[in-house]
Amino acid sequence: YLPNGDLAGGSVILGLRSGLDLYANVRPVKLFDGVMHKVHGKFRQIWEPEMVDMTILRENTEGLYHSLLKRASNRAQGLPEYTIPEVEFPDLHGEVVYDPRPISSHGTERLVKMGFEISKTRNGAPLDGVSRVSCIDKSNVTRGCQLFRRTFDSVASNYPDVATDYGYIDAFTQWLTRTPEHYDVVVTSNMFGDIATDLASVLQGGMGMAGSGNIGDDHAFFEPVHGSAPKYAGMNKVNPIASVNSIQMMMDWLGRKDGNAEILEIAKAIEQSVSCLLYTSPS
C-alpha cells in the first residue's frame, strides 16, 4: 500500500477509469454450455445455460470509489493530490475515517442511457424475451440512490418500448441467484455493481469466465473481472477465458463504434469459438 493507504499500482487501471472518463463498467453474465458450477467443493450443473444471459452496467467514476479514483487519476497525470472535504460527524468518537459517496444526475443519466441502448442490441431476458432494464439501488435509505432512481425514470421515459423494473440491492442479490432468467440489462451504482457482478460471475462458472469493459463516449479498455490470482502462482494453472471474452467485447465495441462489419464478424467468431471449446471440453 502507498503511504496514503491506496493500493500500490492502482494508478494504472483506476487512473484510466477516471482520467479517461470511462463511466460505464459493462459486465456480461452469460453461461456457456458445458460449464459446471463449483458448489460445496464439487462441480455440478446448478443453473441452466439458456437461463443465464444478462449484462450488468456498473457506474464507474462516482459513488463510494470517487475519491480513490480521483486520487489515482491525479497521481497518474502528475497532478496535486486530491483530498476530500472535511466533514463533521456528530456523536462519533475516536478515529473517524470516511469515503464520500457522491452520485450525480449527469453521471447516472449517461450510464442509464447506455443501458437502454445496449438493451436494443440484445434478445431480451431469457425468461420471456422481453427487453428490460432493471434499476438496482437502495433508494429506500440513501439520498444518492433516490437521485439515481429519479434519473433512471427520466431516461426510461425516452424508451417506451423497453420494459423497466426495480430492486433494492440487498434483495437483488438473492433474486440474481434464484431467478437470473428474469434479467436482461441491469444498471446500478459503483460499489453495488462491484459486489453484485462478482456474485453474478458464479452463475457463469466463476471469475475466470468473466470479461468486462470500461467504456466511455470516446475511449474504452477491456479486462478480465478477476485479479492476478496469486493463489495459483507456480502451479502451472491458467484459465484464459475471461481474457478471451474481454477481447471479444473489445472487438464488438470497436466494430459498433466504427461501423465496421468485418470487426463485428471477428467478435462473433471469438464468441462462437469459446462456446464450441467449452461445449466439447471437460469443465
Question: Where are these predicted regions, by residue range?
Answer:
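Short glycine-rich or small-residue beta-strand-to-loop segments that form or flank ligand, phosphate
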Residues: Y1, R132-S139, Q248-D252
